């Protein structure tokens, strides 16, 4: 009994002591605070614990009481907390008496004081920035407010103050949280299923059907909140003070203007009926008269008449028409003579054909049956393949795609251009009349003298031979490459265009040999030697410094080609050197030797015979070199060059230079020192170019089996692209006389001769007619015809092949 009485008396004593302690703490705090501010470190309980240490007697008594309370069992304390009715009575009794007033008085007293944490105050003061305004007054810039921790965007007061603790922690407890005073918020009683049904039927005011977990009750919305939601949904202003229908101020129409803005009299068309409207009205009237437009009242009459007027025997009205994109399945082909029950004898198979047909796979057979012969139709047995054929037919209809092919009603003859007959375009070479034999290796190059009497050939055996055209006899031979030198070959050679000089330029590896063969008369040979030797005197007496810089200055194009601005002396020393021949070479007719940096592949003379251009694809910026015979000068016109240079030629009569790289052809003006045009043939790898004698057309050959005709007056793309060779095209040449002929040589061993007429009228396109395909050279190691050259006067064609022979093709 004593134990029970002690347990019952404990809550009262605890409440009284706590109230007395709090009152004493507040009084001490009021006395100590001079500026009506109380700085509290932590919470009020911690401050109370510090005051308890000052009162030793009260502390001893409270320790004894706490020991007595600790002696009580946990079960009794839980029972004390679990008794809701007793606690409610105790709370009501205790807080209704004077102690309740005392606790309330503490909050009243604390309401007028400013409580702030000392640590927070020091942090705020440290983060403050003290500056001055422009007038000198002190200015304090306070730190920014953290929107996550220093503010709250919620307008409603939080009823349940459990913080971030999940509500699932209170599922097994009778309460759902604590209010701001620390009291428990008891879980509201749940009604039965019948009560919930009645609530769903009779909806209370502000019912939303939502459940508020913080309070444990249904969420209700007030009329003001509903009105706010309605305004937001209707996109109306939520502020009642804003009037959306305020009277507007008519700035322009408020004052009536007496005078008109424009006093122009009204035109007559405003009062006359419109002609365009009259046309539209007449168009509608004609449509009504013709019956294309039916008035609404007559439409109903026609529909009623059509109900009773129909074709009784017409069964196709219910069938719908196919869609415009519908493709019907093709019909089965009709049976042939082989499928007859009594076919002719020639349609029947013999024993070998039957055996071969049976051994073949079903997919490889041209027909899936063996023709049979019966004397009469009544002897024909049942067809065993009917089911299989129907199944295959279904597979074809189901799996085979169908496409619609529009038939072109075009006359095939209209697609073929109207070309003249080759018989009307004679003369042109049609047969091989002479074969020049003597070289042991393939002949890479050949050239014919300007007078048309001598043919020069260069071969991989290292020799240069000169032949008499009329007889086919060899008249001159010189060896430029030794037998032990396997790296160098005779790459190219060409006669000087001046027939009075008799100079032959031959290329062997890195050297250029200027030869005057002893086959001409004394005058021509002496003239050629003097022309070459005059350059030595120019070099000896040092007249180079007196001449102007003859470097070709070409503006850089899109591939960053620049002009080399070095002087002539440095240019000659850098790019190549001129040497005099030794005694043996002089006796062989060699008058000068030019040594370059890399292997030279192509050579071409200027029409006057004083300049010639060479191409070294591996020499980089000095790939193109221009040499002057009369001064023994060599210069590189370009400082930089992207791509590999394949060929270079002078214009027939203009001061222009054509340079062909792997993919592009550039035309440079040597007088104005600019890039004139850039041609884009569209080929992967160009091999050779040639210019028409009139200078307005160009031919290019490529290793990807193309022959490209460029009209220089038109665009930069080819006018015609000819693809008639089976392998790489090695050479392409125009006839230099007045004959409109050109030919191309390929590795397929064939030579194609074409007729190409260029008209004076710029509006007329060139006429290209294929004339003849010449074959005769053998293909050795996938190489066929390597070079071509036309006779300067006749319609004769010379060709050099990989079989070690040169051929003359005549009419």
Curated annotation (Swiss-Prot):
Function, in words: Component of the NOP7 complex, which is required for maturation of the 25S and 5.8S ribosomal RNAs and formation of the 60S ribosome.
Gene Ontology molecular function terms on file: large ribosomal subunit rRNA binding; ribonucleoprotein complex binding
Keywords carried by this UniProt record: Nucleus, Repeat, Ribosome biogenesis, rRNA processing, WD repeat
InterPro entries: BOP1/Erb1, BOP1_N_dom, WD40/YVTN_repeat-like_dom_sf, WD40_repeat_CS, WD40_repeat_dom_sf, WD40_rpt
Gene Ontology BP annotations: maturation of 5.8S rRNA from tricistronic rRNA transcript (SSU-rRNA, 5.8S rRNA, LSU-rRNA); maturation of LSU-rRNA from tricistronic rRNA transcript (SSU-rRNA, 5.8S rRNA, LSU-rRNA)
Compositional bias annotation for Polar residues: 1-11, 104-121
Pfam families: BOP1NT, WD40
Segments of this protein annotated with the region Required for interaction with YTM1: 386-422
Annotated family: Belongs to the WD repeat BOP1/ERB1 family.
Protein name listed in UniProt: Ribosome biogenesis protein ERB1
